[in-house]
Curated annotation (Swiss-Prot):
Record's signal peptide: 1-24
Record GO terms (molecular function): neuromedin B receptor binding; neuropeptide hormone activity
Propeptide residues per the UniProt entry: 60-121
Methionine amide found at: M56
Organism superkingdom: Eukaryota
Protein name per UniProt: Neuromedin-B
Keywords: Amidation, Cell projection, Cleavage on pair of basic residues, Immunity, Innate immunity, Secreted, Signal
Organism: Bos taurus (Bovine)
Subcellular location: Secreted; Cell projection, Neuron projection
One GO process term, biological-process aspect: Leydig cell proliferation
């Protein structure tokens, strides 16, 4: 074979390869949208707010029931007076049984008084 025949065959092979590659290319490539179509999308500066309220939970105008909160209903100080008196008497009897003085305050009472004053402000 002459040099010219080899060149023609090589050129023919390259052309055939290019045609096959060009024919298969649109099937295998996932090309992005053209720039003209992509530029038409509006961008909102505050972002997409479609699900803002969806994740915020149920809104209710009524206060939650005590059974749902796991706490007892609100009771006044007058309702609690007998229980508090009973508890105070029990603490005083325990202090007396342990030999502690009832007139001397406990060491942390000063801190407790400061905390109570701060909370009342």
């Amino acid at each position: 074979m002459t040099l010219r025949a080899v060149g023609v065959r090589l050129l023919g092979g390259l052309l055939l390869f290019a045609l096959l590659a060009a024919g298969a290319a649109p099937l295998g490539w996932d090309l992005p949208e053209s720039r003209s179509r992509a530029s038409k999308i509006r961008v909102h500066p505050r972002g997409n707010l479609w699900a803002t309220g969806h994740f915020m939970g149920k809104k209710s105008l009524e206060p939650p029931s005590p059974s749902l909160l796991g706490t007892a209903p609100h009771t006044s100080l007058r309702d609690q007076t007998p229980q508090l008196s009973h508890h105070l008497l029990r603490v005083l009897l325990q202090k007396q049984a342990l030999g502690m003085s009832l007139s001397v305050p406990a060491p942390n009472t000063q801190h407790r008084r400061l905390l109570v004053q701060t909370l009342q402000k």
